[in-house]
Swiss-Prot record:
It is found in: Cytoplasm; Endosome. One of its GO terms (molecular function) is epidermal growth factor receptor binding. Residues 100-191 form the SH2 domain. Residues 38-98 form the SH3 domain. This is Src-like-adapter. The lineage of its organism: Eukaryota, Metazoa, Chordata, Craniata, Vertebrata. It comes from Rattus norvegicus (Rat). Residues 206-312 are annotated as: SLA C-terminal. The keyword Phosphoprotein applies. One of its GO terms (biological process) is regulation of MAPK cascade. InterPro entries: Grb2-like, SH2, SH2_dom_sf, SH3-like_dom_sf, SH3_domain, SLAP_SH2, SLAP_SH3. PANTHER family: PROTEIN ENHANCER OF SEVENLESS 2B. Its main location: cytoplasm.
Amino acid sequence: MLCRLPGPSTSRGEKEMGNSMKSTPAPLERPLSNTEGLESDFLAVLNDYPSPDISPPIFRRGEKLRVISDEGGWWKAISLSTGRESYIPGICVARVYHGWLFEGLGRDKAEELLQLPDTKIGSFMIRESETKKGFYSLSVRHRQVKHYRIFRLPNNWYYISPRLTFQCLEDLVTHYSEVADGLCCVLTTPCLAQNTPAPTAQPSPCTSPGSPVTLRQKTFDWKRVSSLQEGPEGAENPLRVDESLFSYGLRESIASYLSLTGDDSSNFDRKKKSLSLIYSGSKRKSSFFSAPNTLKINALAGTQKTKALTAT
């Protein structure tokens, strides 16, 4: 929480003067005093590093880095988007708390981050004011970047408009995320939120990582190729399937295979037809030559019958 912590108790070193007690002015309370021991969510890269004039950048503006270690003025960090790990100077990054509270950047850098590609209308950040230490500014992406000063009352409550005060910055963000209430637009997403990588889906145990998604159709019956080849329509698409599911090379291979098997099947059909003709011809021939023999037998039987009648 960023709500104000209880104020410090009266110091014992205060100097007593007469009946009045004069206390040394307490240092201006920072609303983020409870973040000093809090680990930041991430580091936001403010400039390409190294400079493109020196070498290809390892980290680019707008990237989000996860801190590995603090090396005293340098950070050892890893990019949340590319996974690259390297050192980067502290002046090239800003520490980010709660996703929207930026430390270590000014007005110009805030505008650069909010104007990055894919930044949505309503993206915002809260940053420390450059002109008044201990005060903060709200920067919002609209048609152009708008800046609103966040004032603080003596009781350490915060406000943008005096008619509406908040006990902490989180309450302020929550309110203006629901209604614009005088701002250029409603606060939608924290700055750089669109650069957060989406969680990677765990691969199924039945599929190897990186295996392509395949579409499975009904098993093709190669015995039906001859029947599918009949007719001009079957010759063009013998498989009768959606050609978009097959690559051009695969379709060419299938066409070549079908042309080869088509020649073999046609030869087989011709041989089969020839055999059937020979068989039918021989059958006709045997029936043709059997007719005279039948006549001879019938004639012989008639002669014998005639002789028998004559004898009687």
